[in-house]
Swiss-Prot record:
Organism, scientific name: Homo sapiens (Human)
Domain spans labelled PID: 93-250
Phosphoserine modified-residue sites: 236, 247
Protein name according to UniProt: PTB-containing, cubilin and LRP1-interacting protein
Chain positions covered by the region annotation Disordered: 229-250
Role this protein plays: Increases proliferation of preadipocytes without affecting adipocytic differentiation.
Entry GO CC: cytoplasm
Expression tissues: Expressed in subcutaneous fat, heart, skeletal muscle, brain, colon, thymus, spleen, kidney, liver, small intestine, placenta, lung and peripheral blood leukocyte.
Biased composition (Acidic residues): 241-250
GO biological process, one term: cellular response to leptin stimulus
Signal peptide start and end residues: none
Amino acid sequence: MFSLPLSLPLCEDTAFLPSKCCSSHKTIKQARTLIMIFLASGTHFQTMLKSKLNVLTLKKEPLPAVIFHEPEAIELCTTTPLMKTRTHSGCKVTYLGKVSTTGMQFLSGCTEKPVIELWKKHTLAREDVFPANALLEIRPFQVWLHHLDHKGEATVHMDTFQVARIAYCTADHNVSPNIFAWVYREINDDLSYQMDCHAVECESKLEAKKLAHAMMEAFRKTFHSMKSDGRIHSNSSSEEVSQELESDDG
């Protein structure tokens, strides 16, 4: 029985081969042709698939820009107006200034003389009515005095008073019932201190009384906080608190 050698060359001249060999050789050539067609079609399919993927990729490229830029734009839209329309809770007042005072025992009427001095200084430049030039905000542990511009808007300049350093406050003054004043212990650069009396004029007597009550409440919260932290002895009375605060804060 005749069989095709394994090392048979793919020769164009097959006349010397038997008919069975010719048919086998023809079959091999057809198989090779089919393989080439399949490979070509596969390459075309891969090329087509790659082009489709490229199209899809190109279409999706702008999406990250939308995803990352949109929230940023929304954030700017929401935060920018808030910065422009930022408001502070507090009472609009006319800050009369401060003057140094002496003594360590602050009783009823101790702010009358300093307030009269500040009132006289301020009335020299007074026209008809004092325009509000500050916003006084009393918080649990601090008092913020926001200075206003000529438009009545809060500026970046603000004076901060620690409630623990406030020795006395009152809204009871003979010169004007609308004045609220407080005595504050100011620490100097050389660690020495001085007692300053600050005064503001409110729009009404009621507003001045409200500030006095708010200051008293802030002082109470500060006292209880320092007492719970052990910074004030449990048997300390309200009269001894100012001395405790001064020794602790100095």
